[in-house]
Amino acid sequence: MRTLILCFSLLFALLTQPAWAIFGNNAGNNTGTASFAPTQNRFVPVDEAFPFNAFQQGSTLFIDWQVKEGYYLYQDRISISGENLEIGEYSLTEGEPYHDEFFGDVKIYTTPLSVPLPLVAYQSGAKVIVQYQGCAKAGFCYPPETRVIDITPFNAESNRVIEPKTNTSTQTTLPQTDNAPTSAQDSLANKLAQNWWTPLLFLALGVGLAFTPCVLPMYPILTSIVLGGAQLTQRRALLLSVIYVQGMALTYTLLGLVVASAGLQFQAALQHPYVLMGLSVLFVALALSMFGLYSLQLPSGVQTWLNSLSNAQQGGSLPGVFAMGAISGLVCSPCTTAPLSGALLYVAQSGDLLTGAVALYALAIGMGIPLILVAVFGNKLLPKAGNWMERVKTLFGFVLLAAPIFLLERIVPEFWSSVLWSALGLAAFGWLYHVKNSLPFGGWKQSLIGIVAILGLLASAQPLLNHWLAPTQTAQQVKQIQFTRIANLSELQSALAEAKAQGKSVMLDFYADWCVACKEFEKYTFHAKQVENKLSGFVLLQADVTKNQPQDIELLKALNVLGLPTIEFWNAQGEPVPNARITGFMAEQPFLDHLTQQGL
C-alpha cells in the first residue's frame, strides 16, 4: 500500500492545526434586588430562558426543558441524581455539535428536551436532584442551576402512585407537558448521524496499524492458521477470515463498552486539570513507545497462555476460527499496544457507550481488512516488507502526541497551546522531510511528500514567528490586567469603601471558568493597550464564581446578576453608575466607547 504514507501525511497535516475548544454554561436565580447597581438586564432570567417542568406518573418522572430562541443548554452539564431513591437507566437525546474557540467541541440543545426517568426503589424523603447549565448565543452564560423534585411513593410493578401527596418542593412546579420522549431508535440514529466521522477515523487507524512491522509480516502465517492449512475455495476462505475478524471485533467492542462505561462514571474527574495532565503524560509515554524507545506489551506469561489457548482452537471451523479471533483481540503486539491504549483513553474521555463500541469495532475491522484480502487473494496483494513499516509506526507516534495537546489546551494559556502545536508540527513535518528519500516510491509521489512536508513546516512555524516578530504584542498578551479578587459581599463592601476614600472609580468583573465570553474579555479586551491605560486609574475587582458556592450566589443576587459575563461600575463617590453594567462580550473599541459614554 504505497499510498498509505501519502494519506497519513495529509491526515497529519490536518491534525496538527490548532484545535480550539467549547463548552460553556449555566443558570442562576433572579430573586434578589440590585442593592448596589440597579441596572436593566439585557438577558432574561434563567427560568425564562430554560423553563423547567417535571411531573411524576407512577414509577416514571418526566423532566422537561423548553429552550428560548437564542439560548441553548449544554448536554454534558445536565446531571440527574437521586436522594433516598434508586434511579434506573436513562439516556439523553444526542445534542447538536457546537464549537467554541476556548472550550472545544460539545453538544448543545436549542430545542425542547424531555427525559423520562425510571424510578426503581423508594425510601422516605425521596428526591430527584437535577442540575443543568446554559448560555445565550449572544455570549452570556448562566451559573449552574439546581432543581429539587420531591417524589411520591410508587409501586414499580403496577406503575401507579400508592399514596399521592402534594409536592412540597419550592423550587420546581410539576405541570404535565406535551413533549414526547425521543424513541430509542431515533436516539441511536441521531448519535450515528452526528458522529459519522468517528467510525471512519478508527477504521483508517485500524488499516494503518495493519501496516506496522509487528503486524503485517504475521498475516500470511495467521491466514494459514485460520484456514487450517488447507486449500479452500475463495468463498470459504472469505467466510472463515470474516468470522475470524468478527471474533476479534467482538473483543474490541466489549473493551470499548467497558472503558466507555467506566469513563461515564468519572466524567467530572476526567475534566480535572490534574487528571488531564496525568492523561497527557500517559499519551506521551505511549507515543515514545511508537518511536522505539521501549516496548509495551502484555507480560510474556499472559501472552503465552493466550497463544496456547488460541492454538488449541481448530482452524478451518467456524466456531474455532471465531474463538481464535476473540482471543487474538487480547494479544497486543508492541506496535498495537500504544495506539489501542490511546483509543481506549479516547472513548473513556467521551463516556459514550455507542461511541466506544462503534469506534473499537471499526478499529478491529480496519486491522482485519488486510487479513481478509490475504485469505481470499493470497500474499501477492501485500506490499513488500521494509523500513517503510517503521515509518508508519513512527507516524502513529506523532498522531498520539497530538492527544495530550488536545487535553492540555483546556487548561493552559492560548500562547502555550499554540507553542505546543507548533513544536509538534515542526517535529513531525521535519521528520517527514528527512525520511522522504527512504520511502518505497520515488518520482512525483516523493516530490509530493516533500512539498507537503515543507508546507507543513511553514504552517507550523507561523505562530512562533508571529510571536517573535511582534515581541511587544506578545509581552502585552502575557501581561494581564491585575485584578483584586473578592470572595463575598463583605469583601466587596470593604473594597468599595476603600476606593471611595481614595477617590477612585471601581470596576467589578464577574468571572467563571465555564464562561466563554469571560475568556474573550481576557484575550481580546483586557489585553488591549488602550483599555489597560483607560483602567489604570480604576480599582479593579474580580469575583470568581466558578464553583457557584453560597457566598457566590449571595453576591450575584445582591447585584441582580443573572449570568456571565457581567461587569459593574461605581464612580469615585462610591455610587453605582446607572446603565453602566456590561452583559455579554464587548471588543476593545466598544468597551472604550461605553466607558466614555458613562463618564468613566
From Swiss-Prot:
Gene Ontology molecular functions? electron transfer activity; protein-disulfide reductase [NAD(P)H] activity; protein-disulfide reductase activity
Subcellular localization is given as:
Cell inner membrane
Q: CDD domains in the record, alphabetically?
A: DsbDgamma
Read off the Pfam families from this record: DsbD_N, DsbD_TM, Thioredoxin_7
Q: Does the keyword Transmembrane feature in the UniProt annotation?
A: yes
A biological process from GO: cytochrome complex assembly
Disulfide bond positions: 135-141, 214-335, 515-518
Membrane topology reported for the UniProt record: Multi-pass membrane protein
Task: Show the catalytic activity.
Answer: [protein]-dithiol + NAD(+) = [protein]-disulfide + NADH + H(+); [protein]-dithiol + NADP(+) = [protein]-disulfide + NADPH + H(+)
Residue intervals on the Periplasmic side: 22-195, 260-273, 336-356, 413-414, 460-600
- The signal peptide here is 1-21
Q: Where is this region: Disordered?
A: 164-183
> According to the UniProt entry, which residue ranges have a biased composition of type Low complexity?
166-177
Function, as annotated, reads: Required to facilitate the formation of correct disulfide bonds in some periplasmic proteins and for the assembly of the periplasmic c-type cytochromes. Acts by transferring electrons from cytoplasmic thioredoxin to the periplasm. This transfer involves a cascade of disulfide bond formation and reduction steps.
Full protein name: Thiol:disulfide interchange protein DsbD
Provenance organism: Vibrio cholerae serotype O1 (strain ATCC 39315 / El Tor Inaba N16961)
Name of the coding gene: dsbD
